[in-house]
Amino acid sequence: MKVYNLENIKSAAELKHRTEVISMNERSIIVLDTFTGIAQKLQAVSISLFHLDIEKVMNQLQDFENDCGNWLDNLLSSEMQKAEAAKEIKVHIDQISRLCNENPNIIDDHEIMAHGAMISSLILSHYLEECTKKNFILNSCHFMRLGLDRKPDIKYVKKNVEELMKACPDVPILITQSRL
C-alpha cells in the first residue's frame, strides 16, 4: 500500500499537479492536510467568533462558501459533479453556521477546523472521481486516537483502519485527514 502525504496545497493547479502521480494500480491512502486557503479563512472565522462578531462570521462564511465554489470551478468540468460537491460542502458550512449561531461563546475552533479538513477531503474526492479515480473518504475521527504520550496509538489506528477498509475493498484510493 502506498501512502501519499498532501500538505500545503494552495491552489487547484497545485492539487492537480500533486495528484497526477497517484496510481490506480495499487491501493493508496492519501493523508490530506486542510488546503491552505481554507484553513486561513476558517481561522479568521474562529477569530471573529472569539470576538463574538456574529455578523462578521456570517459574512466570512458566505465568502468561504464562494471560495469553495471557486475551487470546484477550477477543478471540475462536470456541472453535475460540481452541484453534488457543492451540496456536500454546504452541509459542513451550514453546520459551522449553526454552531456559531447557537453557542458562539463555547464553540471550539478545532471543531470549525475539522469541517475545513472534511471540505478539503470532499473537494479532492470529487476531483479524483472526475479523473475516473475511484476513492473513498475515511473520516480520521473514526480511527485516530492519541496515546498518553500525545502520539498516535498505532495499534488502535491500524486495527480501526483495517476495519474501515473492509467496507470498501474494491476502492483503490482512500482519503483521510491529517488533523481532525
Can you say where each PLM-predicted feature lies in the sequence?
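Nucleotide/pyrophosphate-binding catalytic subdomain
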Residues: M1-L180
